[in-house]
C-alpha cells in the first residue's frame, strides 16, 4: 500500500533475510523497487523503475537501510522518474555498485556519507565503478545532480554521463 492509501504497491521486493539475490527481473509499478536491510544480497541484471509518486510517497529505486553488508548491485538499468529521492540510497558496509545505468531521482545516488545527512558514520567500503548516468528525466541525471553525500574515502571510478562526460563525486 502506498503512503496515499491507494492499492498501489509500496515496495516491490524487500530483503530482510541474508544471502539472497534478484536476477534478470522486471521490477516496476512500486514506490520503492528494492529495499535491502539484510547482508549478502545481490541485485543483478534487472530493470528497476519506480512508478510516479503519489502524495506522501518517498520513491527510491533501491534503498539500503540500516547496516547491510556485502551488497552487490551490478549490470542493472535503474530509473526513477520522480524529482525527489534517488535511484540508489546507500548505507552499510562493503557495497559494490558496478556497471549499472542509472537515471533520475532528486539526486541519482545518495552516497551514504554521514548516513545521508542524518548523522553517524554512514556507508563505508563503498565502490561505485563504471556506472553510466542517464539524462532520461533530468539534465543532470538527478533533478539536483548525479550524487550527494559521497564519502571521499570510498571508491568512485570510471563513472560518466551517457554522452561520455566524466562525473566526479
Description of each model-found segment:
Residues 1-5, 16-32, 39-53, 69-81, ...:
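Right-handed parallel beta-helix
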Residues 5-14, 28-35, 55-65, 81-92, ...:
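Extracellular beta-strand/beta-solenoid scaffold signature
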